[in-house]
Amino acid sequence: MSSKGSVVLAYSGGLDTSCILVWLKEQGYDVIAYLANIGQKEDFEEARKKALKLGAKKVFIEDVSKEFVEEFIWPAVQSSALYEDRYLLGTSLARPCIARKQVEIAQREGAKYVSHGATGKGNDQVRFELTCYSLAPQIKVIAPWRMPEFYNRFKGRNDLMEYAKQHGIPIPVTPKSPWSMDENLMHISYEAGILENPKNQAPPGLYTKTQDPAKAPNTPDVLEIEFKKGVPVKVTNVKDGTTHSTSLDLFMYLNEVAGKHGVGRIDIVENRFIGMKSRGIYETPAGTILYHAHLDIEAFTMDREVRKIKQGLGLKFAELVYTGFWHSPECEFVRHCIDKSQERVEGKVQVSVFKGQVYILGRESPLSLYNEELVSMNVQGDYEPIDATGFININSLRLKEYHRLQSKVTAK
């Protein structure tokens, strides 16, 4: 059978994408396997050997950890991005980073197709494909879990296991956890399986990035985090003097400290873009510390009215990232606006990391809008208390008029 052309498969080395690799070959494609090193615990060389053994024409292992931190996580920190008030977007931010490199490989190798193992019910299919179509409008996407000839043949894990046995695909010898996991440098997510019942508590052995807060050390770690233009540039452990100032080292160190103290666990039900609710359990250790520290230095240095506008932009940014529109013109516009808002967000924040919590201890900044003399209860400063009388009178006028009308309506 003549080849239908080359396809770059986002390959993890797991059962699903290993079966997809062989299935794509069955369909007549030359498969190029692509593994993104985005900070997950993975034996990449073993995965390379496995992909080649299964018939991949080429295998690319690309380390995108540094660009993930600097080009995706840092903008999220600047924006204080939270989806539905709780989710720090660990998976959502990783997908455009992974897909961008996939497109680069496809263009470099002259491949007309890309493929992924995302399910037809989730958000990731949208995130991967919107990135691909944005960066390479002519690319063609093969999404097996949306193709009847695939999902009618493989109706569950047992079907995949049987297919693997038939085609010599190595099957994991360790028992599979009764839930699915997805890990990157920023977080790890747990979904599906026994977690689909939202009433079920997370089993004690589920968490892998963070210590049980009840078993965490009995003394806190105190960290000083320095920001410039809203981006963390240095972290110092006040207790032992440990310092990190490169993006990747800084982030990994915060993961280590936060994980040791059980910081960054959430268990939520969220609204998927596709329209259904899903239950997810997430661990985001470093991201949680940075969220709190950045929020504090921002409030210390940013004008009140600018911050109100920026908060709205942060909500929009979170929504766009979650729904896969990283490369949209509106997301580009929002990122530029947030960048502008961060020009004065500079200074140091001290935090205590202890028993699952992040406590702000203090802050300082050369660009602070905080005026100690002006706000002091002991010094009058450049402020006349009598001026507050007129301020209150003017602001009460609207309320007086509203309640005057309400009195008339009530009297009828």
Curated annotation (Swiss-Prot):
L-aspartate binds at residues 119, 123-124. The modification Phosphotyrosine is found at residues 87, 113. This is Argininosuccinate synthase. InterPro entries: Arginosuc_syn_C (IPR048268), Arginosuc_syn_N (IPR048267), Arginosuc_synth (IPR001518), Arginosuc_synth_CS (IPR018223), Arginosuc_synth_type_1_subfam (IPR023434), AS_cat/multimer_dom_body (IPR024074), Rossmann-like_a/b/a_fold (IPR014729). Binds and is activated by Bj-BPP-10c, a bioactive anti-hypertensive proline-rich decapeptide, part of the C-type natriuretic peptide precursor. Pathway: Amino-acid biosynthesis; L-arginine biosynthesis; L-arginine from L-ornithine and carbamoyl phosphate: step 2/3; Nitrogen metabolism; urea cycle; (N(omega)-L-arginino)succinate from L-aspartate and L-citrulline: step 1/1. Acetylated by CLOCK in a circadian manner which negatively regulates its enzyme activity. Deacetylated by histone deacetylases. GO terms for cellular component: cell body fiber; cytoplasm; cytosol; mitochondrial outer membrane; mitochondrion; neuronal cell body; nucleoplasm; perikaryon. HAMAP family: Arg_succ_synth_type1 (MF_00005). Homotetramer. Interacts with NMRAL1. Interacts with CLOCK; in a circadian manner. Forms tissue-specific complexes with ASL, SLC7A1, HSP90AA1 and nitric oxide synthase NOS1, NOS2 or NOS3; the complex regulates cell-autonomous L-arginine synthesis and citrulline recycling while channeling extracellular L-arginine to nitric oxide synthesis pathway. Belongs to the argininosuccinate synthase family. Type 1 subfamily. GO terms for biological process: acute-phase response; argininosuccinate metabolic process; aspartate metabolic process; cellular response to amine stimulus; cellular response to amino acid stimulus; cellular response to ammonium ion; cellular response to cAMP; cellular response to dexamethasone stimulus. GO terms for molecular function: amino acid binding; argininosuccinate synthase activity; ATP binding; identical protein binding; toxic substance binding. The gene is Ass1. The keyword Transferase does not apply. ATP binds at residues 10-18, 36, 115-123. SUPFAM superfamilies: Adenine nucleotide alpha hydrolases-like (SSF52402), Argininosuccinate synthetase, C-terminal domain (SSF69864). It is found in: Cytoplasm, Cytosol. One of the enzymes of the urea cycle, the metabolic pathway transforming neurotoxic amonia produced by protein catabolism into inocuous urea in the liver of ureotelic animals. Catalyzes the formation of arginosuccinate from aspartate, citrulline and ATP and together with ASL it is responsible for the biosynthesis of arginine in most body tissues. Indirectly, may be involved in the control of blood pressure. Disulfide bonds: none annotated. It catalyses: L-citrulline + L-aspartate + ATP = 2-(N(omega)-L-arginino)succinate + AMP + diphosphate + H(+). The modification N6-acetyllysine is found at residues 112, 165, 176.
